[in-house]
């Protein structure tokens, strides 16, 4: 069996581009292998900062291609169409034959059975694949026409011990590979795919990113264990540093303990995001220590690498401490007026205006959920005050977090301080939501104010663009409501928020604002339920029947129905509805014109008809108290109890009675029952109903 190997050697490619390109090139190669029906045993895509490698093992050396018929233009088409078809398939007029298929009479040609040399096939197809490879970010260099992630320097292409020769823009493939450092870079001849991997390994180049990741985790774990630190490295950072080195080596460094007075989040951001270092946390104290781990591309026998990293971190932390010492003395309350100088959005006023609207709306929400009104207004008033500080200007990712620490140092309560940091939450679909009542009020008010503003001036998200993160804001509101079990009328809050804009003399031009927003909320709510793997028929049954803006009640109802739908209670309720619905559908024309769900007891001629009506009225009375409908489990139980009565009803009573009045009256009874069921949820949406 044969082995194909391709290496694309370039200047260093950022880790994110490596991940995308590995996936893209795998898809393109697999598509081509499938197109030619080429079997193989193992397909691998590897990358290092400078290398992108495709390895396909267990290939045949030749490929037998059977003859096949190729459909051309319809018989009677212009001669140019037929000529183009023949040219594209390298055929002549004598090769053409006519054939009738479903869509009419067409010209066909039949290819010849042939045997392809796979080495030659790769020489043709690989340049096509490389040309179709797309990059999220790309560049041109020198005077070359090639667009690539980073300047491409060489192409190695082997089929067993033979070079697969092809040209790609200004480069020609070869059997040579670059090894050594940038300063001492040299080319080495490769005789086979097996030798390629061995030469790289001998040069401390681990081509397999999965193997490098294991090395990173193992070396981190060894240092954490030795220093009695928590062994829980950030896995995103692990993936990133894995793609930044050829041969990962973990090195431990330290910094001055004076910097430990800085907020932990600031230390984390400086080390992890800016320097790609792994902070270390003591197992004993559960606090961050003045040590860190960096992943190097080389061993550091002379301590030069770690010394350099320590100096860089010292400088960064010194800058952070300078801003911290400078800003922490600034009074948050006095900072609020400075928000007048920051525009929220050109048509929506300043951040000061936004803060005042958020304060009033949060105050209203505090009455609904029982939060401390005074503290809520204070928290909302200063929730954006840290945005005018140099520290947040330098570290914008820490907006809110910095405000929290300033608030604590200035004597505000922990609830107010937490609201400043937590009102931005959740930042993503898996982030925690605010749990304290004051933080909930400010978070809901801030997100609603943003939504009202942008929807109000017609800047709604499109299918491809959402520059103001409005989908995230909506999903955040829904999650805050559901996860904190809050029954809130969003429409009422939307109207209040709109009035606050109008009182600021900001024109809200969208006349259908509330309806548009609730529809947008419903769409995101459906997506949330889908992500939770809830049955779509259950979701549709509830949302079709309930145009509610109380998303916690809807969520409770959907999850309860989903829980009971496969239990005896749920199956009984569906079976009862289905049997009655089938009979009604058989008499659709009669029902459409004359049946409205109002049975006449005078026309009853059996006890079971009266019993069924009593039970239906009992359920209707239960439904007249809206709060009872929130107990979905009890409701399903009640609906399921009807089955015993309906079973007896269908056994003892002939619905399609010979007496037309009796028949219609029994249809009235069944329609009343179905309508009563549908008051809870639309049973017709259930699969099988």
Regions found by a protein language model. Give the residues of each.
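Amphipathic alpha-helical "coupling" segments that flank catalytic cores
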Residues: 1-689
């Amino acid at each position: 069996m044969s082995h194909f190997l391709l290496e694309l050697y370039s200047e260093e490619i950022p880790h994110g581009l490596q991940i995308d390109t590995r996936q893209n090139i795998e898809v393109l190669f697999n598509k081509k292998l499938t197109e030619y029906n080429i079997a193989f045993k193992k397909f691998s895509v590897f990358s290092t900062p400078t290398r992108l490698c495709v390895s396909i093992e267990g290939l045949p050396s030749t490929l037998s291609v059977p003859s096949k018929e190729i459909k051309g233009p319809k018989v009677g088409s212009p001669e140019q169409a037929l000529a183009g078809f023949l040219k594209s398939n390298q055929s002549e007029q004598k090769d053409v034959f006519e054939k009738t298929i479903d869509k009419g009479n067409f010209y066909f040609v039949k290819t010849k059975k042939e045997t392809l040399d796979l080495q030659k096939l790769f020489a043709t197809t690989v340049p096509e694949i490389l040309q179709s490879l797309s990059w999220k970010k790309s560049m041109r260099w020198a005077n070359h026409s090639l667009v690539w992630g980073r300047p491409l320097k060489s192409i190695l292409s082997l089929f067993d011990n033979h070079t697969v020769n092809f040209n790609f823009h200004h480069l020609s493939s070869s059997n040579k590979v670059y090894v050594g450092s940038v300063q001492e870079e040299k080319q080495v001849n490769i005789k086979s795919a097996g030798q390629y991997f061995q030469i790289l390994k001998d040069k401390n180049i681990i081509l397999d990113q999965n193997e490098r990741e294991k090395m990173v985790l193992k070396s981190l774990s060894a240092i954490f264990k030795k220093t009695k630190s928590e062994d829980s490295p950030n896995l995103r950072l692990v993936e990133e540093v894995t793609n930044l080195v050829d041969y990962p080596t973990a090195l431990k460094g330290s910094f001055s303990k004076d910097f430990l007075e800085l907020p932990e989040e600031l230390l984390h951001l400086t080390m992890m995001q800016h320097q790609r270092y792994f902070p270390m946390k003591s197992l004993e104290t559960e606090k961050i220590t003045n040590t860190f781990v960096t992943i190097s591309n080389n061993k550091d026998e002379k301590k030069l690498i770690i010394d350099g990293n320590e100096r860089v971190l010292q400088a960064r932390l010194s800058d952070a401490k300078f801003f911290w010492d400078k800003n922490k003395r600034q009074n948050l309350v006095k900072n609020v007026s400075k928000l007048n100088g920051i525009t929220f959005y050109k048509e929506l006023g300043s951040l000061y205006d936004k803060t005042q609207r958020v304060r009033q709306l949060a105050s209203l929400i505090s009455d609904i959920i029982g939060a401390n009104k005074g503290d809520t207004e204070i928290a909302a008033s200063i929730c954006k005050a840290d945005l005018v500080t140099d520290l947040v200007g330098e570290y914008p990712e820490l907006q809110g977090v910095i405000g929290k620490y300033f608030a604590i140092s200035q004597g505000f309560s922990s609830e107010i301080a937490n609201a400043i940091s937590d009102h931005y939450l959740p930042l993503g679909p898996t982030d925690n939501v605010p749990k304290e009542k004051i933080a909930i009020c400010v978070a809901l008010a801030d997100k609603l104010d943003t939504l009202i503003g942008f929807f109000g001036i017609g800047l709604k998200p499109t299918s491809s663009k959402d520059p103001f993160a409005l989908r995230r804001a909506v999903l955040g509101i829904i999650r805050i409501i559901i996860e904190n079990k809050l029954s809130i009328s969003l429409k009422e809050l939307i109207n209040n928020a709109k009035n606050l804009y109008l009182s600021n003399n900001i024109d809200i031009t969208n006349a259908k604002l509330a309806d548009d927003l609730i529809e947008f909320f419903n769409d995101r709510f459906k997506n949330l339920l889908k992500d939770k793997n809830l049955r779509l028929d259950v979701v549709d049954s509830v949302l079709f029947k309930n145009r509610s803006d109380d998303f916690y009640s809807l969520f409770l109802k959907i999850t309860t129905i989903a829980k009971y739908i496969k239990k005896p209670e749920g199956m009984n309720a569906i079976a009862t509805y289905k049997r009655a619905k089938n009979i009604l559908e058989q008499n659709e024309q009669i029902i459409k014109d004359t049946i409205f769900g109002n049975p006449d007891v005078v026309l009853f001629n059996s006890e079971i008809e009266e019993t069924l009506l009593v039970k239906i009225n009992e359920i209707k009375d239960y439904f007249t108290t809206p709060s009872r409908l929130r107990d979905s489990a009890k409701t399903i139980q009640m609906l399921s109890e009807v089955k015993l009565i309906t079973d007896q009803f269908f056994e003892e009573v002939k619905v399609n009675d010979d007496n037309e009045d009796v028949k219609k009256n029994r249809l009235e009874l069944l329609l009343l029952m179905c309508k009563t069921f549908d008051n809870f949820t639309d049973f017709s949406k259930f699969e099988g109903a």
